[in-house]
Amino acid sequence: MATFSLTSTLPSSSPTTSLHSIPKPKLKPSTINFTHNLNPFNPNLKPSRHHYLSNYGPYVKAIALDFSGSFFEGGFGGLDEDPPSTPPAGLAVEEKPEPQCPPGLRQYETMAVLRPDMTEDERLTLTQKYEELLVAGGAMYVEVFNRGVIPLAYSIKRKNKAGETNNYLDGIYLLFTYFTKPESISPLEAALVTDDDVIRSSSFKIRKRKY
């Protein structure tokens, strides 16, 4: 029989049985293969000091640049060190003894407001001129403080010797402190009033408070 001989030549096991009988390879989870590529994690491991500085170095450096000129200038010496306790620039009070008033002299202050468009050389020349004028009048312990350009409380019109009128909204403030004779104030005020570089000036005597 043709049908009998054909079936006798086929394998004894059916196709379904042969597929199930093939052993399947045991695959490891992908997470296991991934963890093999990582370094073992140690929960007690702490970042080293070098690692901390490398991550935060640019941030600390930016603070030092932003606060250049203040008590942050130069940054901190180290992360374990406290920031310097020096007060901000402009607020530090230098402890020095106040000069005693010489006999026959009085303590005065003169505030002079200069043209805001003066150059630095012009300002220094004017400052030296009035310092010499004060010393020639018998003044002692002359000190000058440059307050910089400050807006005026109100605009000031001033005519110079050439007949030109200027309207000033701000000026360079100079403060003179000194000891001198009372009669030397009038020549100083006369020189300031006639100076084209001086917008406004005022001199007054310092009175000590009595407690």
Curated annotation (Swiss-Prot):
Gene Ontology CC entries for this record: chloroplast; ribonucleoprotein complex; ribosome
Gene Ontology terms for molecular function: small ribosomal subunit rRNA binding; structural constituent of ribosome
InterPro entries in the cross-refs: Ribosomal_bS6 (IPR000529), Ribosomal_bS6_sf (IPR035980), Ribosomal_S6_plastid/chlpt (IPR020814), Transl_elong_EF1B/ribsomal_bS6 (IPR014717)
Gene3D superfamilies: 3.30.70.60
Residue stretches of biased makeup (Low complexity): 1-19
Subcellular locations according to the entry: Plastid, Chloroplast
Disulfide-bond pairs as recorded: none
Region called Disordered, residue ranges: 1-25, 80-100
Record's keyword terms, sorted: Chloroplast, Plastid, Ribonucleoprotein, Ribosomal protein, RNA-binding, rRNA-binding, Transit peptide
GO BP annotation list: translation
A matching Pfam family: Ribosomal_S6
Presequence extent in this chain: 1-65
Main location: plastid
Described function: Component of the chloroplast ribosome (chloro-ribosome), a dedicated translation machinery responsible for the synthesis of chloroplast genome-encoded proteins, including proteins of the transcription and translation machinery and components of the photosynthetic apparatus.
Subunit structure: Component of the chloroplast small ribosomal subunit (SSU). Mature 70S chloroplast ribosomes of higher plants consist of a small (30S) and a large (50S) subunit. The 30S small subunit contains 1 molecule of ribosomal RNA (16S rRNA) and 24 different proteins. The 50S large subunit contains 3 rRNA molecules (23S, 5S and 4.5S rRNA) and 33 different proteins.
Note: 5 different forms exist, S6 alpha, S6 beta, S6 gamma, S6 delta and S6 epsilon, possibly due to different transit peptide cleavage.
Family: Belongs to the bacterial ribosomal protein bS6 family.
Protein name: Small ribosomal subunit protein bS6c alpha
Species name: Spinacia oleracea
Taxon lineage: Eukaryota, Viridiplantae, Streptophyta, Embryophyta, Tracheophyta
Name of the coding gene: RPS6
